[in-house]
Amino acid sequence: PDPNISIGDVGVPEEIAKELTVPAKVNKNNIGDLKKIILSGSKVHPGANYIVRPDGIRKKITDDNKKDIAEEIDTGYVVERHLMDGDITILNRQPSLHRMSMMAHRARIMPYRTLRINLAVTIPYNADFDGDEMNLHVPQTEEAQTEAEMLMAVENNIRSPRYGLPIIACKHDHITGSYM
């Protein structure tokens, strides 16, 4: 739990952010930024793990080839960059018994090795921090990212679809801590 992040954010460890990728289509407006990301390589955040050429060939970015790849990319390429602050993700806790157990959060890259959410968001996930396993998914198309943001964002799902009461609220230790 992390009471210092927004209800719409999920704290993602840098180690995980380097494995999860977001496809970025290269165009004349972002080519400079994507070249810098490629030159960072796959081991430094923010970096990139792969590029996809317009003919569909996928190339892994390594320390040995990152300069060549940065020179090669042009409009039409896709760079599979690391997850960065503000990217849309979908957080899930099994079992998914209702739609509220999968909601969209914005990534916030943080140190340490655990996923973090605000305490007020634990109710829909039925999370109690006793070793719960949470799954983080990254939508891979612009359409999926927009759909997740519009339909699944925590801020758009504060009321329960079942009985209309707020499900983003203080509960258990949160209330006790506020009293103390």
At which residue positions do the language-model features occur?
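Flexible helix-coil linker/hinge segments at domain or subdomain boundaries
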Residues: 157-168
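Short, conserved secondary-structure transition motifs
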Residues: 166-180
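Core mixed alpha/beta domains of very large multi-subunit molecular machines
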Residues: 1-158
